[in-house]
Amino acid sequence: MTVDLREEKELAQQRFKEICKHAKIVDTHNDFPYLLRVQLRNKLQLAEFDFENGLTSHTDLVKMRQGQVGVQFFSCFIECKNPNYLYQDFDTPTTVVRDTLEQIDVTRRLVCKYNNDLKFVDCADDAIAAFRNNGKIAIALGVEGLHQVDTSLAVLRQYYSLGVRYITLTHNCDNPFATAASSITGGLPDRGLSAYGIECIFEMNRLGMMVDLSHVSHRTMHDALDVTKAPVIFSHSSAYTLTEHERNVRDDVLERLKTNGGVVQVNFYQDFIRKPGSDRATIDDAADHILHIIKVAGWEHVGLGSDFDGIPQGPKGLEDVSKYPDLICKIIERTNATNEQIEGLMGLNVLRVWKKTELVALQLSKKLEPIESSWSGRKWEFYSYAKEFPELFPDAYKLNEKSTVWNYDQPLNIEK
């Protein structure tokens, strides 16, 4: 390394250190709770689980402090039910809601267990305070796919009441709301957003739930941008122009973020950021994706969504959560960015989206009632004896005959 390059690097580090006196890192996607599920069955009291002093995962408290993390969104992720990532029989009962609740529970218990260092946040102002202060790390919740609401907007509302503040419209499967990027990769048609999906976005806007467009198809991105009243996020996606993968964001969508106000949080997964022909992605590849998004959309529309602990390994130079400072310093070295622009990249951009989403909800909630629609393909099954109970009003039982299945001929048995 030449003297000039060494000095440039040292200056970037000094500047980052100064910025960190009043700004921290916000990461919108980390799958650490999934490791707790698949490896520990969500048991946090095991002696071997030493989150406070260091683990071999991408994430632990030591690495988070080293990485200058101020706000971390943990993903309450549960897989699509079909191992082939196809999701056509949407009305088959699953355990996905139970499993999602367990992930919300274990994340909140983690915060309680380490409450000297972590705190739970469910509003933008509290997250902004954590971003600005050198205190406890703020933990927020996201859900990675509307398959996890099991076709029900009522479940969506209950997730919000439990503190979930963004939901990804799809994971690696279609659902009644939207088309997934994985379906396009698999050769299936891009149907975009369904009519029910539009209603879902309106309900998310009404609640103050951020709309996450990572994992969705190209058409779904445009459809969502056409109807949402609030800015969107891409919680963990990168730039399609640099790495042509359906999980990434094309330039025509990046252009629309200037009007929508949304952000792309750059993902560190190898397949989404490495150069064609390269065996492994590097920290410079991640920086390239950040800079491309800035070039097309602007400094206000980019952030960090690593996908740590949901990917096998990080890029070279970005091996775990502790390495965020190296990436920010790389951007400082390669640009003439102002401190305000660097703060936006570090996390203020996505916190602005969160705050704007809350303000939109404040206005909509004054005018709109909760959306009571259900998926058109849903069958409501009841025991036949239910028809023996009093009607709420004449012919109430006939209102929903087309979607009702009376296929349980079990007699009413009331013990006196």
Curated annotation (Swiss-Prot):
Assigned protein family: Belongs to the metallo-dependent hydrolases superfamily. Peptidase M19 family.
Binding site for Zn(2+) 1: 29, 31, 144
Name of the protein described by the UniProt record: Uncharacterized dipeptidase C965.12
Keyword annotations from UniProtKB, A to Z: Aminopeptidase, Hydrolase, Metal-binding, Metalloprotease, Protease, Zinc
The organism's place on the tree of life at top rank: Eukaryota
Natural source organism: Schizosaccharomyces pombe (strain 972 / ATCC 24843)
Gene3D superfamilies recorded: Metal-dependent hydrolases
GO biological process, one term: proteolysis
PROSITE patterns associated with the record: RENAL_DIPEPTIDASE_2
